From Swiss-Prot:
Domain of life: Bacteria
Protein name: Ubiquinone biosynthesis O-methyltransferase
Keyword Methyltransferase annotated: yes
Residues reported to bind S-adenosyl-L-methionine: R52, G72, D93, M137
């Protein structure tokens, strides 16, 4: 299978854009060319990706031979790593530039996966129950209606399948660490990457999950030690956190 980007041109423009923030798309389009630069704006994503992947592998029982959907795949960092584990990966994103970068990198790396420029809501209409595993990492805080994303992910996964979310908690500590610290002091990510008003409390995310056939399985925090320049997982979910859910059989 040759990696491809589907523009889904047949979909009405208004429908395609209903849960998309054009400012967020433009923000990531502008830096997409540096997505795979290990020392660039996406350095933190490259650093946390092994943690994300290991968590997904452990909680899902492995990905080999499974149909996996990566929602908000961007330039393909997580999507490629899951494909290397033997998964049949599809990546979704609404940013044309990140998808172009993802497609090119996959071709250069010889990794087999497919990319589509399509909203997750549209994909859920066309492919309900098509996936064994769905991942939605660092994406919910960048859309107008994150609850809609959760519902679509629940629709896309098979009964008994796994859905993984990651996002940022909304509180003063998260503002201090993720915005003041990461964007202004340490300059780990570009200024303006995050908006505290779009951060999501775990209780809010769990509430949206409870309104679907998904059920919480595990939640864990993602932490950064600036002295050692190292990310690690821990029980505290005050800032970044990952949630593992499973669709009821």
């Amino acid at each position: 299978m040759i990696p491809e980007v589907s523009n889904e041109a047949s979909q009405p423009a208004a429908h395609r854009q209903e849960n998309v923030d054009p400012n967020e798309i433009a923000k990531f389009d502008a830096v997409a060319a540096r997505w795979w630069d290990l020392e660039g704006e996406f350095k933190p994503l490259h650093h946390i990706n092994p943690l994300r992947l290991d968590y997904i592998l452990e909680r899902s029982g492995g990905l080999f031979g499974k149909n996996v959907l990566d929602v908000g795949c961007g330039g393909g960092i997580l999507a490629e790593s899951m494909a290397r584990e033997g998964a049949k990966v599809t990546g979704l994103d609404m940013g044309a530039e990140p998808l172009a970068v993802a497609r090119l990198h996959a071709l250069e790396s010889g990794v087999m996966l497919a990319y589509h420029q399509q909203t997750v809501e549209e994909h859920a209409e066309a492919h309900p129950g098509a996936y064994d595993v769905v991942t939605c990492m660092e994406m919910l805080e960048h859309v107008p209606d994150p609850a809609s994303i959760v519902r679509a992910c629940a629709r896309l996964v098979k009964p008994g399948g796994e859905v993984f979310f990651s996002t940022l908690n909304r509180n003063p500590k998260a503002w201090l660490m993720a915005i003041v610290g990461a964007e202004y002091v340490l300059r780990m990510v570009p200024r303006g990457t995050h908006d505290i008003t779009k951060f999501i409390k775990p209780a809010e995310l769990l509430g949206w999950v409870d309104d679907t056939p998904l059920r919480e399985q595990h939640i864990i925090g993602l932490h950064y030690n600036p002295l050692r320049d190292r990310f690690y997982l821990g029980g505290n979910v005050d800032v970044n956190y990952m949630l593992h859910t499973r669709r009821q059989a």
